Amino acid sequence: MVRVSEDLIRRRAEHNNCEIFSLEEISLHQQDLERIEYIDKWCRELKILYLQNNLIGKIENVSKLKKLEYLNLALNNIEKIENLEGCESLQKLDLTVNFVGDLSSINSLQENRQLREFYLVGNPCAEYEGYRQYVVATLPQLKWLDGKEIERSERIQAAQDYPQVQGKIKEQEEAYLRKRAAEREKATNNLQQKQKEGRKAQEKKPGFDRRWYTDINNTIPDPVEKTDTVAQLNVDETALRNDDEEEEKEFWNQPSQYTPESRLETHRYLEEKRKSKENRSEEELKKKPPRTLITAEGRVLNVNESKLDFSLVDDEENNQFVLDLAIYRHLDTSLLDVDVQPGYIKVLVKEKPFQLVLPAEVKPDSSAAKRSQTTGHLVVTMPKATEMIQTKRAKSPAIAERTCKNPQKCLKTHEKLEVDPKARSIPDVANIVQEKKTWAQGPLRLHRNSARDTADSEDFIDNAEVPPLV
């Protein structure tokens, strides 16, 4: 049974900075509440209260909410309208799909002078003959009933027919109350019968049979007998699950009436199933075998249960291994446990192992683990156990000359790129064409280039009649 608590109200009051005393609106729908309590003491300033889709069977503990304007109690188990006289500012009341059969209980709403909207659709009383006329005549302050506006002519007609309608409503109420009494008695008998069947089924289940077996000669079970026992346990577990499935199927296929008792029974059945499922999952987690990190033969296995990204670098220059494990950035370092062994490394991340076999032996006492503050990665440096002598590459003379003995002076000096001076020379554009030029002295004269003497070809004929070419 879920009850109204201060923690629940504060969680539903986030829009008001989790303040309860000044809260004006709160929604407590679908919380499986069976009672209304503490709200009138903690939230005196409430104007809107949502309590739909719960298991509330009685209207109570709301009379001190003097500023309450809207109360929603749809989809509950309410059978009678009561305890609302103190809600002086109540303007809208929603009792859609409840079990209100006592229609004469609406007389208690005559003191709510501000009531303008009223919803009773989906209740047994809404099927009574003359239901609407009776409500309109009983509550003259109403303007809307079940989402339909009340006209003046309808109000006058309801007031005129009120004596006849009141008698009909009284007869239908008595018939419904007798029916409800029979339903309650039947539900009580069914509940008692199911409890007896449950006790019998519990007694038939295998368990302690009140006898002790202390045979000293049989303290170590036979392997064959042990295998048979495990197989029998698996068979029993499968049979138990099949029985649960059949029981659930039978429950949902069983016809039942829509009553407050059936709603409560369904809710409790679902709660039991949910709890049994949680317990079963916890038991399965407990029964889960531990992860094998080292086999019986002594072989170390690679394990990455957390599925973290990692990289293992062989730093030959420094003769060490560097492991970079991508730990979550916001994970607390106290949840990490690093264990470096000569042949492997194991890291526990929130009790989940990460184990990696190393290519060569390392020195555990000289290893170091560091955590990055920006990325959160775990970097483990593991020096190799066998030291290797390696030759370093000699620096070239040009680099050696440029190395500075005083690093502070080297930082201040500007290094320039050395280039061959000939490569920087600018080409002489004026002397691109190598040709002698003649310059005239004095008055302007026309200079012609001297004709070049060329040898005559063999077929040349000197004809005097042909004039010379100028």
UniProtKB/Swiss-Prot annotation:
Region feature (Disordered): 182-265, 447-470
Sequence ranges assigned to domain LRRCT in this UniProt record: 128-146
UniProt key word Oxidoreductase: no
Gene Ontology cellular-component annotations: cytoplasm; cytosol; dynein axonemal particle; extracellular region; motile cilium
Main localization category: cytoplasm
Gene3D superfamilies with a match to the protein in the record: Ribonuclease Inhibitor (3.80.10.10)
Pfam families: CS_DNAAF11_C (PF23602), LRR_9 (PF14580)
Coiled coil: 177-288
Family: Belongs to the tilB family.
Protein name stated in the entry: Dynein axonemal assembly factor 11
